[in-house]
């Protein structure tokens, strides 16, 4: 028998796909017999005592091979079982293993330049040519002499078996494009390529041009013929009991000797070979496995570090994750988001303690991933370890209180707790489920929800304290008292004390609402009598003028009494971030103020000049004698009672009363206290300038 020759690992990986991971020589892996049986697409009958769900092994040898007829790539891996299958094994140094080698897998080396293209109907036609993408022609192919007319060259490429192929590469057409002409039809016919297959070009480290093939599904397991699903390879994630129809079809093809395409790859994994490998692994003897990466089944020899890392996470329903999928032609990798819907053993009869396909998932895009119902924990990347907790409505009158430790389990969820040595417990149950009645949500959780609404969303540091990813030796959750360390007692005290006065605060905020004050003006001060209009201007009767005058005087007096209550709470928070010497200037009818730097103003005269320029307001010579302001205590003072430097430090808000009856609120006078000469009945119709410090 001719000895098998290992192929170029770089071209092998380019044909297998970028997401395929073959373990390195001397590395440690967990061998999953359950996954190996899925790869054979038939549950073998071992006729032996229960096999451990995972077996720790060392990689003795790796051979990269390809089928002589179809160029389908596969690998033969020799594994040696190691003592101790515990997941708490931290590193390989305990076993005296050497660091993983990077010779066979290309690990640790820079990936060579490669390009893959799915063949179109024109590319696969007999007698036609191959349209080369520009990127491939300029980066993978040898440099083309564009000065020649036409630019043409002969390209020599090696396939997966080392056989050379010659193609004529020409740059022509309108618009111009790169084409492979002579020699391409021969390659298509001998390789039996069809539209949908992919061609891979790779530039090796030695500079040689290599060509590989990725065949599209032609029926059998994992085939989605006639489907619009752009990710047909996802069907390979189906379990045996979820694809009985396809399995029967595959077995019929095997019996009929039909080994075309991918069916050939999967058909070569004999059930007897799987049973023999599992039996030898269970006895601690070296064994060999064959893996076809294009068979669309998960890898069953997984890096030990990846499995340990995944099983340190305390998985439970509601966790958010993302998972990478490669398209059937391996042209791109897409990430899909999902939620863990349940954590349950996939096959509790044959593999009761196996983490293989432990997670039952629900996808955000179920149409694309309708066949992927279960995944293994090491295939997903956790996005949020905080499960979704559905709470019943709570009463807003309840005061917040700190939840007690026994009140904070995850209600209505079940998740297993694996012990570090769960793989050794052949027949015993080594996982426990925590379950609670979802109908009786404790008040502590309701209070926590209320606190989140009052104080905002939890900070990242708080969420990090709610760590669900650590295991303890006795298979118990950490005490939920860890939630107490994340709860700020000062916030709790603040809410417990101030909730008694919540009604008063609510009233104060309502009184300071500008919209409600404006509505009050409209409802009280509006006159329902008929108005006369001359040239678009309303003409008020004497009674209307008196009513409005009386209303506005009463409104002004009320404003002075409750000014701080009405405005203080509404604008105080917006002014807290102002630096010393800065204040906000508001027109009466505007909610958005302008920031004014008082530190650059040296006197009150300059202040009014600045305000006049800012709001385009006329300035009067007697302005200073009529201006008053309020200090922080609400005491009315006149300008000059304190130096301008002290006034500048204390002032945070300036409010300019507008012309109530004028047409243009911008064209108003800045005056002092209303008098009979320049009040609301005067021709200027202006109000006072109030300065709130």
Swiss-Prot record:
GO CC annotations on file: nucleus
Domain of life: Eukaryota
Compartment(s): Nucleus
Keyword entries, A-Z: Auxin signaling pathway, DNA-binding, Nucleus, Transcription, Transcription regulation
Keyword DNA-binding recorded: yes
DNA-binding region coordinates: 115-217
InterPro entries for this protein: ARF_dom, ARF_plant, B3_DNA-bd, DNA-bd_pseudobarrel_sf, PB1-like
Matches recorded under Pfam families: ARF_AD (PF06507), B3 (PF02362)
Major localization listed first in the record, in broad terms: nucleus
Example of a GO MF term: DNA binding
Any GO BP annotation: abscisic acid-activated signaling pathway
Protein family per UniProt: Belongs to the ARF family.
Domain text: Interactions between auxin response factors (ARFs) and Aux/IAA proteins occur through their C-terminal dimerization domains III and IV.
Stated role: Auxin response factors (ARFs) are transcriptional factors that bind specifically to the DNA sequence 5'-TGTCTC-3' found in the auxin-responsive promoter elements (AuxREs). Could act as transcriptional activator or repressor. Formation of heterodimers with Aux/IAA proteins may alter their ability to modulate early auxin response genes expression.
The protein, known as: Auxin response factor 10
Native organism: Arabidopsis thaliana
Gene name per UniProt: ARF10
